[in-house]
Amino acid sequence: MARDFSLEKTRNIGIMAHIDAGKTTTTERILYYTGRIHKIGETHEGASQMDWMEQEQDRGITITSAATTAQWHDYRVNIIDTPGHVDFTVEVERSLRVLDGAVTVLDAQSGVEPQTETVWRQATTYGVPRIVFVNKMDKLGANFEYSVSTLHDRLQANAQPIQLPIGAEDEFEAIIDLVTMKCYQYNGDFGEEVVEIEIPDDYKDKAAEARESLIEAVAEANEDLMEKYLEGEEITIDELKAAIRQATLDIEFYPVLCGTAFKNKGVQLMLDAVIDYLPSPLDVKPIVGHHADNPDEEVIAPADDDADFAALAFKVMTDPYVGKLTFFRVYSGTLNSGSYVKNSTKDKRERVGRLLQMHANTRKEISTVYSGDIAAAVGLKETGTGDTLCGEKNDIILESMEFPEPVIHLSVEPKSKADQDKMTQALVKLQEEDPTFHAHTDEETGQVIIGGMGELHLDILVDRMKKEFNVEANVGAPMVSYRETFKTPAKVQGKFSRQSGGRGQYGDVHIEFTPNEVGAGFEFENAIVGGVVPREYIPSVEAGLKDAMENGVVAGYPLIDVKAKLYDGSYHDVDSSEMAFKIAASLALKEAAKVADPVILEPMMKVEILMPEEYMGDIMGDVTSRRGRVDGMEARGNAQMVRAFVPLSEMFGYATSLRSNTQGRGTYTMYFDHYEEVPKSIAEDIIKKNKGE
């Protein structure tokens, strides 16, 4: 079957923003105008097409990146709607990995908000070109100029309007296109009728000035345009469009548009901009992976149907009707349903049962996928998030995604024996879907412990266990994921010798422990000379250290950010074994704990609090009382924003406290930033609690 859309006419885009900026509504309107849905679902009514999980419709937020395909003019647009809540940044990270371009949605009253900064940084890391849509122009306090200024001030972005709004709040009625110098008026409460009108006289000078600024900003990234501009030559619409496109693709410029998705104003022009300025799979650099057997050998996956098949699985979901669904992005080649693929990450052969094109949670079966496509496969049993799928003769591994470790834990106990079996299944499936969700059984207490990125994250997962898997469970209080580390170097010996008739056990190691850089993790160095510890026992020493570090040395928390150098030791020809050296290494760690000044570390969260100015004193006092450190303050319109680092242990239940301190007018976001040493008095309490005193 031939492809329906050429690669040039394909766009893979994401819609990204801060929570409540109107991403999902914007996506809904795109689907409406591209003919994918006939009735528009409003997020605040809990009926949105893209928010298809029950938890999403209850809460009015987007949790999982729903992928959907739409058609605009004769182009195919694959859209991924990403969550704006900070607990779900991993979903954003996953979708950015497989996109070619993105639309950043801003709230016209707030401009760039904390989560916008986070996703913007992620998009920059992955080299994703962006256009900006200033949404909610009909909202009280909407201010287009202010929103654009926040792009410069908070993101240092070379962003320039390619449109101007006429009016704001309930007076917002028309948009001037600065590229074509045409003006579009929206009539009716919901912009049902679009009419092209003359630019009003009182806007002519402003529009001419704004077009001049636009040309200047684009010319900075385009020598030919700069030359024409300096010589005072007329720049044609096509030349300006081409220059904007090139500068956007090179990530040197960000076009800014405006509108109100809820009132259907500006969405069609934004779709035109997606086609005009965001890349096709041919415009982005071919993805580079490495050979499965040789990490140093680069392998390129070109955007070409005739090349070897290569794709990246970026999401796994459980569908109530078809079972496990694996979403993937095809980078090169084609794939037919029913054929076999190789999962080169795990070196497994998989059969693709069916191929589906997704529209939020409805699906259309297709027989073939081509390079540049985003689709879902049924039947891939072994494939997880971040795995590479390729042709059976191909040996490429595409760069996978790195996911943060959980910072918050809860215990969950099934209410009955029947719930226990269902819970085990549910936890396996939820971990397959979400790499930042961890579950394990505590060896001492036998409790099941789940870990995630924040209270909301775990809340929703427990909710899903109940609703999707019918698991009734008792949930414990949240627990912080503390860590331990050494503050000073230590040279120690660990010796294990046992003789009890027959073959004995003997292992002897001398290890130098030194603190590692924050966030660098554990590093092991083999500095043995002359075979005093035979080569075959070296991995056992490292494994023994890693095992012992899992249970810490102070209060039972994992030991991190430590270097261990094995520099001496001894062995016995008959009695030495892998197990003996493993035990010797763990004894060395215990010895080091006596002299290396071990301390407990706690997760520090970066917290950003927005509130009316009159509550500033109360909020600052509250942050300090939670052992927080204020990192900065700035005015945001007529509100104040406080940035601070606060220990996670002090942030439980903060939403309630903020509500009462600001009479419901304050909002906050927080995300994990780094680990920091716990004050001595608090460390003592943690140790006592862990010992059950």
Curated annotation (Swiss-Prot):
Transmembrane parts of this sequence: none
Keywords attached to this entry: Cytoplasm, Elongation factor, GTP-binding, Nucleotide-binding, Protein biosynthesis
Record SUPFAM superfamilies: EF-G C-terminal domain-like (SSF54980), P-loop containing nucleoside triphosphate hydrolases (SSF52540), Ribosomal protein S5 domain 2-like (SSF54211), Translation proteins (SSF50447)
Binding-site positions, GTP: 17-24, 81-85, 135-138
One GO term (biological process): ribosome disassembly
Any one GO molecular-function label of the UniProt entry: translation elongation factor activity
All copies of domain tr-type G, residue ranges: 8-282
Family statement drawn from the similarity comment of this UniProt entry: Belongs to the TRAFAC class translation factor GTPase superfamily. Classic translation factor GTPase family. EF-G/EF-2 subfamily.
Function: Catalyzes the GTP-dependent ribosomal translocation step during translation elongation. During this step, the ribosome changes from the pre-translocational (PRE) to the post-translocational (POST) state as the newly formed A-site-bound peptidyl-tRNA and P-site-bound deacylated tRNA move to the P and E sites, respectively. Catalyzes the coordinated movement of the two tRNA molecules, the mRNA and conformational changes in the ribosome.
Listed name of the protein: Elongation factor G
Organism from which the protein derives: Staphylococcus carnosus (strain TM300)
